Amino acid sequence: MANISQIEQYNKGTLFPNTYEETYLATEHISGIKLNIPDDVFNKLKKAIEAKGLYFGDDSVLRNIIAGLIKGNIILQGPPGTGKTTLAKLICDVFNVDFTEATANSDWTTYDSIGGLQPTANEEGQEVIVGKNGYVVSSILKCCDLIVQNEYEDGKQQGNWLVLDELNRCEIDKVFGDLFTALGSDSTTAERVINLWYQKDENKQKIYIPNRFRIIGAMNNIDKNYVNDISQGLSRRFTFIDILPPAEDYFEKEASNAKELAKTRAYFADMLAQVEMWIAKQKKQHDDVRKENTVEAGVGFGCGCVGCFG
């Protein structure tokens, strides 16, 4: 545990802690460290997606994901079964960041995103009220710890991102509205701060969002029972990218390609029947998804599609 003198040095930026658990104020001094963009990031992401069995019909999907992350936070929106959550985790791996995963629901409030008060028992068994950080703040703290470790230790991940699944199930503006200014990609360091009213320790009543921190949301925008409106204020804080099933003629083209390969490659001819059955199965699954794709939510990027093979 750090003593008062050490915490003062952390807060002034003259000394860097191994962890920011004891003083959030010190996060100001590493908040400006830029996100490292991996060399050849496009091809690395493309290979990672292909290795996982995902299909993308247009390279612009990946280019827009990368551009969106360089700018700030992104939301992957589309029907279920198109690989949005898997894609989000692959993105984190390619960018060399750890991630905190959470699944939203209709009961979420700012308590879940930022934090609030909760009862607990102290060492004497008495009930006390303490502050509890929400998913955003917890992920930011992990991000700050990794930023410092990455600066001084080889092989460390460069940060921690928050992956939010089923984002459409919560009242998005109510849950994240208090973060509007702080989440702005053009916000200054002074603005990229979250006030934590529920923390009693004055060293923990404010936390700065690192430049390296990102939120990747995944939204099912076709479920009429769970599609919540997104205000223009919040939509400007995220880049929305459509993750859709493959084009209707994609599987016919793949079947045709398989037949052509079978004419010249004997080993492939033996597998042709299995390949055709697999293609037919995938086509039916994606046709079913496409039929349900009738509701729009958020701000569509209109930038291509990604489909899940498996």
Enumerate the predicted regions with their spans:
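C-terminal regulatory/interaction module of P-loop NTP-utilizing enzymes
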Residues: 1-310
